[in-house]
């Protein structure tokens, strides 16, 4: 396995980000770390969250010799990113809610942000709105339950559409034309969200922008040369290496199947003392 790209999230939401990165770098090796023992992150004290994430990610970077870390979690990006960058010598990429492109796209200038309560209330989020959407009416919707519904869908294949409609009723009532998906879990249920909200609402997430940033940083660090070499090798021998790591005592059969279908050949539990 060559030096992998390490994608990190509290749960399965980061798979949506990983999928976007793979479109740009299809022959790279990947590690996916999901800290599902502590899901959802939005309910943890900040210092507890920081200590646990730094320990997990730094240990796995050392183990895998990862060349870049992608924090595919909005909560962790706003809380943990500075500590990770202080403890790692490799690039660390975070998630930024797609407020700017949403404001640019909106014709009615009525946009919304659907995220966890933690992301909705953070000062950083309000700074983004002030900086990039001051000409828009912006509605904020915080909902942790949608995170668990996305996890449940991956685990069982089932989605309670009646409950989803109830949760999204305030979004429908707001009469928006663009809704930012401010949690990486939400693209995993994008079809269901679109079904409830209707075709008149455009859903935007940050996956493509993150992938573009990863390519830029690898180029700046001269690591894109290594990626081209790996690409040539992969074209000769086949599929890239994919490893998944989780922290819960066990994961569901449905989630295991999903990871295998995504191309992961190794699915392993790791532990942390934090």
UniProtKB/Swiss-Prot annotation:
Binding annotation for substrate: 9-10, 41-42, 74-75, 184-185
EC class (word): isomerase
Record flagged with keyword tRNA-binding: no
Keyword Isomerase attached: yes
Pathway per the UniProt entry: Cell wall biogenesis; peptidoglycan biosynthesis
Paired cysteines (S-S): none
GO BP annotations listed: cell wall organization; peptidoglycan biosynthetic process; regulation of cell shape
InterPro entries assigned to the protein according to its UniProt record, in alphabetical order: Asp/Glu/hydantoin_racemase, Asp/Glu_race, Asp/Glu_racemase_AS_1, Asp/Glu_racemase_AS_2, Glu_race
PROSITE patterns in UniProt: ASP_GLU_RACEMASE_1, ASP_GLU_RACEMASE_2
Keywords: Cell shape, Cell wall biogenesis/degradation, Isomerase, Peptidoglycan synthesis
Gene3D superfamilies recorded: 3.40.50.1860
Top-rank taxon: Bacteria
Pfam families, sorted: Asp_Glu_race
EC number: 5.1.1.3
Catalytic activity: L-glutamate = D-glutamate
Active site: 73 (proton donor/acceptor), 183 (proton donor/acceptor)
Single Gene Ontology MF annotation: glutamate racemase activity
Family to which this protein belongs: Belongs to the aspartate/glutamate racemases family.
NCBIfam families attached to this UniProt entry: glut_race (TIGR00067)
Function: Provides the (R)-glutamate required for cell wall biosynthesis.
Identification of the protein by name: Glutamate racemase
Organism the protein comes from: Shewanella baltica (strain OS185)
Lineage summary: Bacteria, Pseudomonadati, Pseudomonadota, Gammaproteobacteria, Alteromonadales
């Amino acid at each position: 396995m060559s030096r992998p790209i390490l994608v990190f999230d509290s749960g399965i939401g980061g798979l949506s980000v990983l999928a976007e990165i793979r479109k740009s770098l299809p022959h790279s090796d990947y590690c996916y770390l999901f800290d599902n023992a502590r899901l959802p992150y939005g309910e943890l004290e900040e210092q507890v969250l920081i200590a646990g994430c730094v320990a997990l990610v730094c240990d796995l970077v050392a183990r895998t010799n990862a060349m870049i870390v992608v924090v595919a979690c909005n909560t962790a990006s706003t809380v943990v990113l500075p500590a990770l960058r202080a403890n790692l010598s490799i690039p660390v990429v975070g998630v930024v809610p797609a407020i700017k492109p949403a404001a640019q796209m909106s014709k009615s200038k009525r946009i919304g942000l659907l995220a966890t309560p933690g992301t909705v209330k953070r000062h950083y989020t309000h700074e983004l709105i002030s900086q990039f959407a001051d000409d828009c009416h912006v509605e904020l919707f915080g909902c942790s339950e949608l995170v668990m519904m996305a996890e449940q869908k991956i685990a069982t294949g089932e989605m309670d559409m009646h409950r989803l409609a109830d949760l999204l009723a305030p979004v429908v009532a707001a009469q928006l034309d663009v809704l930012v998906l401010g949690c990486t879990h939400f693209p995993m249920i994008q079809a269901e969200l679109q079904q409830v909200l209707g075709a008149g609402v455009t859903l935007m997430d940050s996956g493509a922008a993150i992938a573009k940033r990863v390519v830029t940083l690898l180029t700046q660090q001269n690591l894109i040369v290594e990626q081209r070499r790996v690409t040539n090798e992969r074209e000769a021998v086949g599929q890239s290496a994919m490893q998944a790591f989780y922290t819960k005592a066990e994961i569901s059969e449905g989630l295991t199947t999903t990871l295998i279908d995504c191309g992961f050949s190794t699915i392993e539990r790791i532990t942390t003392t934090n």
